Amino acid sequence: MEASISFLGSTKPNISLFNPSSNVLPRRDFPLPALKLKKVSVLPRILHQKRLIRAQCSDGFKPEEDDGFVLEDVPHLTKFLPDLPSYPNPLKESQAYAIVKRTFVSSEDVVAQNIVVQKGSKRGVHFRRAGPRERVYFRSDEVKACIVTCGGLCPGINTVIREIVCGLNNMYGVNNILGIQGGYRGFYSKNTMNLTPKVVNDIHKRGGTFLQTSRGGHDTAKIVDNIQDRGINQVYIIGGGGTQKGAEKIYEEVERRGLQVAVSGIPKTIDNDIAVIDKSFGFDTAVEEAQRAINAAHVEVESVENGVGIVKLMGRYSGFIAMIATLANRDVDCCLIPESPFFLEGKGGLFEFIEERLKENRHMVIVIAEGAGQDYVAQSMRASETKDASGNRLLLDVGLWLTQQIKDHFTNVRKMMINMKYIDPTYMIRAIPSNASDNVYCTLLAQSAVHGAMAGYSGFTVGPVNSRHAYIPISQVTEVTNTVKLTDRMWARLLASTNQPSFLTGEGALQNVIDMETQEKIDNMKISSI
């Protein structure tokens, strides 16, 4: 038996008894005493959520003895189709799984979000473990699946496509699989192709996406109309935060219409800015490819007098690629990311640090994420904010701007001869095939998505949480952007490696500290804080 505690915009929750085997909504409600919520005025997007928190417990549930176990569960088709029949999983007859000690994942298997705990800590948030279930809710010969890719390119997309097709076919005997071409627009423009293991056999060796992609174009009603008209009952959506929000809307419309359609998201972002999961696919490949650009910049600046090389890497709001590429390379003197505001002039500023390094080494390399310093650039260029078709802010070229600022300062103010080298490998990094590590990772993501859809789960995304693959509600990965936390040890390791200034003593430092404190409050907001 489970008890579900519901916080629906009120400080006085209700508790309901819930039978996990029935997959239906709670039926008996009785009020709990009013609880005092920890007030955090900076969290409007969290406090407005109408989240259902399920605390697993014994039959004799006592709220005061709650150990803080929270299951962030994913929807199941039986939630709105209670009479949906189930069938034995075809993997029972699979030779591949014949010698596996434990073929099927138990409904009680969960993955903990936080594995570093102290004595007396609450058990915290958990997610359902990914993997095959003993019962499935689709007959193999009745499955009509489709796959769509949306948003920007990323190494590994083709591997995910290939492994979804091969997973459905080889593990579950599914033969009817469609590829939706050109992103979400492909649903209602009817651009499709049939996918078989033979068709996708070697696409993992190519960069880009075999199905083509686009930004924007999401029209929920048109998309679900097309899904319904075609008789599609499994939808696999590969894309970033905006794409996953679209996937959630598709699931909600499918549920509203009462359709037996499983909607599965596979998170994709080269920036590694997806929340909850350990990392996004393609990230390792991007970091590895970035080394070539950094090495080239280092060779260039070593070969001239007072050489300063700038390498601009991807990272709209999150500086993970720049940070990890810098740590991996060891030839970088300074790393600038969106999360850490910097300033140019004055004591402790970037210009002062550059001059010190040039006097010491006669050259230096700067790695900057594309989203860093955007306020400075916009102010300098007097540019207004514009957005792309996905609603993302169009970034100004901070690399070119910084190159010119450094050149002007040292030429006109310091009267120093300086040789600037600027490298922008953005499209080179994201357009390549995935490396061996990402290929394996993409395979696990694809197979986890297939197992989840066949088991009747819907409105979920997949990914590793503390190295264990889990099913995660889509809302969990779209509510917050994963960013580099300046209070974590990883950023401290980078500062120790480059010996660069922290930029906490100059203009914008106060706001930077406030932002860090706000992030800590978000991280610390657990079930134990209410």
From Swiss-Prot:
Activity regulation, per record: Allosterically activated by AMP.
Molecular function GO labels: 6-phosphofructokinase activity; ATP binding; metal ion binding
Any GO CC annotation of this UniProt entry: chloroplast
Reaction(s) the record says it catalyses: beta-D-fructose 6-phosphate + ATP = beta-D-fructose 1,6-bisphosphate + ADP + H(+)
GO biological process, one term: glycolytic process
Modified residues (Phosphoserine): 121
Binding site for substrate: 269-271, 314-316, 370, 427-430
Known pathway: Carbohydrate degradation; glycolysis; D-glyceraldehyde 3-phosphate and glycerone phosphate from D-glucose: step 3/4
InterPro entries hit by this protein: ATP_PFK, PFKA, Phosphofructokinase_dom, PKF_sf, PyroP-dep_PFK_TP0108
Binding site for ATP: 152, 215-216, 240-243
Protein's cellular compartments: Plastid, Chloroplast
Catalytic residues of the enzyme: 271 (proton acceptor)
Keywords: Allosteric enzyme, ATP-binding, Chloroplast, Glycolysis, Kinase, Magnesium, Metal-binding, Nucleotide-binding, Phosphoprotein, Plastid, Transferase, Transit peptide
Entry EC number(s): 2.7.1.11
Cofactor(s) annotated in UniProt: Mg(2+)
Organelle targeting sequence: 1-54
Sites annotated Important for substrate specificity: 242
Tissues where this protein is expressed: Expressed in leaves, stems and flowers.
Pfam families: PFK
Family named by the database record: Belongs to the phosphofructokinase type A (PFKA) family. PPi-dependent PFK group II subfamily. Atypical ATP-dependent clade 'X' sub-subfamily.
HAMAP family recorded: Phosphofructokinase_II_X
Subunit structure as annotated in this protein's UniProt entry: Homotetramer.
NCBIfam families: PRK06830.1
Function field: Catalyzes the phosphorylation of D-fructose 6-phosphate to fructose 1,6-bisphosphate by ATP, the first committing step of glycolysis.
Name used for this protein in its record: ATP-dependent 6-phosphofructokinase 4, chloroplastic
